Amino acid sequence: MGKLIVVEGTDCSGKETQTRLLVDRFEKENIKVKRLSFPMYDTPTGKIIGACLLGKPDMVNNLLKTDGGFFPEGGGNIDALAAIDFYAADRRYNLPKIIDALENNDIVLIDRYVTSNMAHRGGLIDNKEERLKMYEKIELKEYVINELPRPDMIIFLYLPYEYACILKKSRKELPDEAEQNISYLKKGENAYLELSELYNYDIVNCVKDNEIRTINDINDEVYS
């Protein structure tokens, strides 16, 4: 059974880029590696999340033929307990892919996993005691009830919101409803930092001396 390594991160922190670079480095060392990413937008559960919940512009136009997601309050404002089930269902639906990857590779890299649910849903709760309870509920839901494998390592890429705004200006991809919600993003960022301390994640700071680090510089630290 291979090792499960999860890469989490704040908005625009480069989760996809870093996991793809890790795949390249592992393959050069003849290490069998598989990369997965959640939500899996090309699956039925992923399409529900991308189009109906988050209102991703390209998916909405192709699937729903409307101007936004199904939820009038916006993807970042949906009741936390209701929202966790969408993301948890996507991982449970794709559990066979995770198990197959672990059984046939030395390392499985996942871009966003259960921690993402904990941060983005828990971050919506201002009361710390209730927020910690939410973390526990999500762990129970995903790891115990849905039987997802627990990660061997979680790497957290930390890019503060104000620096993410700089990178967003150069992006061609249109933001979804959650990505346009500043309060949602900032609360998620704070929750990620709290989770990193509570669960002892490996934190990689994407900013040094008030400058965003280069992709390769960050990857060297992630790989080490």
Name these PLM-found stretches.
Residues 4:
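Walker A (P-loop) ATP-phosphate-binding motif of ABC ATPase nucleotide-binding domains
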Residues 7:
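Hydrophobic anchor at the beta1->P-loop junction of P-loop NTPases
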Residues 12-13:
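ATP-binding Walker
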Residues 16:
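Walker A/P-loop
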Residues 23, 162-224:
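NTP-dependent small-molecule kinase module
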Residues 29-140, 144-145:
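ATP-dependent small-molecule kinase phosphotransfer cores
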Residues 115-190:
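A glycine- and Lys/Arg-enriched "phosphate-lid" helix/loop adjacent to the NTP-binding pocket
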